[in-house]
Amino acid sequence: MKSSIIRFSVSLPQNLLETLDERLTHKGYSSRSEIVRDMIREKLNEEIWSSGAENTQGVAVLTIIYDHHQRELNQRMIDIQHTSTHKGNVEILCNTHVHLDQHNCLETIILRGNGVHIEDLSIEIGGLKGVKFSKLTRASRFE
């Protein structure tokens, strides 16, 4: 069901409006309404994820770069993902692996499930020896 659009006004200091308009132009938005809607969605999404509520459901992308020569690292990452999936806490939707160079690989893991468990999985994988970069992007929220 499509929700209706409601108009309302917002009062801003001139310098803040100018900054908003610069960002609107730079990012290619067609209107102030579009950029404000995106900013509101982003902020609400951040607040929901950061609430840590046990019933929070979400979708996220975990991006990691790691040294593929690190002993048993691949197996530990796979074990963590399988354990989380078998417990029913997190669903692994997709896993993409890219060889960056002789030593480093990049993986993206698309996750869906309980927000707290997604965060836990991210921290567990990110903390493994040999993981050089780890970032969880909270891609969307749904009820």
Curated annotation (Swiss-Prot):
This protein's UniProt keywords: DNA-binding, Metal-binding, Nickel, Transcription, Transcription regulation
Function statement: Transcriptional regulator.
InterPro entries membership: Acetolactate_synth/TF_NikR_C, ACT-like_dom_sf, Arc_rbn_hlx_hlx, CopG, CopG/NikR_regulator, Ni_resp_reg_NikR, Ribbon_hlx_hlx, TF_NikR_Ni-bd_C
Transmembrane residue ranges: none
Keyword Transmembrane helix (UniProt): no
Residues annotated for Ni(2+) binding in this entry: 82, 97, 99, 105
UniProt protein name: Putative nickel-responsive regulator
Protein family per UniProt: Belongs to the transcriptional regulatory CopG/NikR family.
The keyword Transcription appears for this protein: yes
PANTHER family: NICKEL-RESPONSIVE REGULATOR (PTHR34719:SF2)
GO BP terms: response to nickel cation
Needed co-factor(s): Ni(2+)
One Pfam family in the UniProt entry: RHH_1
Note accompanying the cofactor annotation: Binds 1 nickel ion per subunit.
Entry GO MF terms: DNA binding; DNA-binding transcription factor activity; nickel cation binding
CDD domains found in the cross-reference section: RHH_NikR_HicB-like
